[in-house]
Amino acid sequence: MDVPVAVNEDKLLLVSVGYSACHWCHVMAHECFEDTTVATFMNEHFVCVKVDREEHPNVDKVYMDTVTMISGSGGWPLNCFALPDGRPVFGGTYWPKASFLRILSLMASMYQEQRAELLGQSAAIHDACSKMYSVKKADAGSGVTRIDLTTTTTALSGRFDHLLGGMGEAPKFPMPCVYEYLLGYAAQAEREEKEERERDGPQPEAPYSATRPSPEAESERVASHVAFTLECMARGGIHDQVGGGFCRYSVDAGWHIPHFEKMLYDNGQLMSLYSHACIQMASQDGPPSPLLPLFRRVVSETASFLERELLVSVPSDREGESPIAFLASLDADSEGGEGAFYAWTHTELREVLGETDYPLFADFFGVSDSGNWEKGLNILKCDKTPEAFALSKGLEVSNFLERLSAVKSKLLDVREQRSRPGRDTKALTAWNAMTVVGLVDGYRALSDPGLLSLAVRCGTYLRDVVMGGGDPEGSGLTLLPGQLMRVCTVSTPEGADTPTVSLSVNGFLEDYAHTVAAFLALYRVTFEEEWVISARLCADHCLQYFPRDMSGDGTTTTLLPFTSSLDPALPSLTVETEDNVIPASNSVMCEALLSLGALCTTASGEEGDTPPYTTIAKNMLRDVSPVFKQMRGLGHSNWARLFLQTLTVEPVEVCVLGPSHLEWGQRLRREVDGLCVGARVLIAASSGEGSCIPLLSEKEALYTERGGPDTLVYICAEGACMPPCDLDGALDTLHRLM
């Protein structure tokens, strides 16, 4: 990764990494980079490179891992010093002006006077990073067991904050994939306990053991804590009580005061998480959870926020509604400072709401005359759900909800007149794909066709624009089949009547993984095979250009590198395995390949065409197993969810063929969602001829032999396929199997 200017001028690189919505990035830019003294010194002694981490996460990861290794923590802005060939030597995060000048002076003098020491330090960092990214091919017998998952759950449970929700101390991040795993673990444990009770009949109650609680007690505690955490987040200031959507994290332990930037990836994933919680709650025996209405509103209001504030229409020659994309983020800052757009004085609220509504809703939103934040400002939060608050005040719930909706509309109208936070101008492929999945999950939870429409239009953008064979503006950009571009900017040049689209940055593994997942999510609710075709095209490109055996000698992992072989080499070739706020790209691709393989595998167990998606995915699970067990699954929650599915879920295949395939497929899909067993059941549907999906084309031959024309359902489970049946028979069979 030589930087010619740095090589020619014999200077260190100073790589500064940030992103549009980062508050402290803007602070350091103003204090240091815009200061004449600092900027002059930087330009005299260094070759300075500014990097948007959202556009180039591969560069960010190389230098962030270095800084984390050196200091024990990371964050943005990220400032890293590197040799002219790009190898890092030292770095840190935010530095105020005086500290930054001292560090600049020290690094400049060390490069001139102690270069050998810097070279040695760089070599040590490079070796450490190479070991970090080296995941060897594991033995077949080293896989994760159910006991390992119990260990993971116990370790996570030990970090629960039972008073305020979430885990650990401030700052608190939502961490959707952690709670997705815990939701799945609790649901699976509940199913197993139910099966055990039905099999064994009533049993005498076992004595409680504080050191070894029963699985049932653990599953109940896990499910309860997930619901409690989602409630606390929904009631807190991290959730925009007026406009919907979530901020990036809470600076306090009680989810009250957010760091006000709003990120697309958070909101897409949280839509999925709250939707899955809704589906799980709705499927439980007995009365519905009192939290279900709150969680439904969170899903709906988050989608409304995305549509209102981040959506852009993308030019297209296709008939019908235009494709859409969602922009990456909203800044924390506006003209009034950090959070000013979202905060209220009690005087402002009283003027907007009037004397009739103000006392009640000031109480509901935790407003005080002196403010509940800083400088007399209030961040709206709720100590109770709307339903619980209404009952505590002796009010009719439905009437209070109507008044609350009207109050939110008034506040939103007033807020829209304020100076707005900066909005990023780029759309990122991976984050849009996450949002497609979130919208699909929201549709499955709420049965709101508007959410499905948004998902399809954004999926169309992913398929036809960023994977569509070239830049619509004729920039000379030519894409290979299935290749993705990461960054899309939609803008209207001065004097032009129509917006233009500009694509840049070759896609990274996370773009491919999430896009394949998005296409498959759309197929599951539309049964339109074009989504499977696109998923295969995208996955095949990824498997070709993200080499699995990077050593060439067959000894390295089947896990995929983060960067395509089409891109210039970086100082380290990163392999992302750790699930963070965004799950590891390898874990997402692994799940996508498992799903794709299920559609492309026949009853004989053969995968229709190469590459063998299922085999690759199983090898990925095998190779990540040693590090998963070493870490007790901590930092690997999405992997834990995949292991849980593959260890405990016997998949059921449902193929619907015939003239009513769409209607029947949708009916069966709704039934599966109602039973909360979506991960266990694969539903595919076709008219009965010409399917491009191997799982269906195999059944089409059987369907044709019967002569049609009736619609039939073919169900395979537990290694055996049952005789074809009608819709009622299929529903009965699913209930029996579940």
Label each region the model flagged.
Residues 282-283, 308-318, 467-513, 520-695:
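Long, polar/charge-rich, low-hydrophobicity segments
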Residues 31-34, 454, 533:
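Glycine-rich, phosphate-binding/catalytic loops in enzymes
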Residues 1-438, 442-445, 471-477, 498, ...:
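Replace the tail clause
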Residues 21-25, 246, 267-270, 439, ...:
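Extended, hydrophobic alpha-helical segments in both membrane/secreted and soluble proteins
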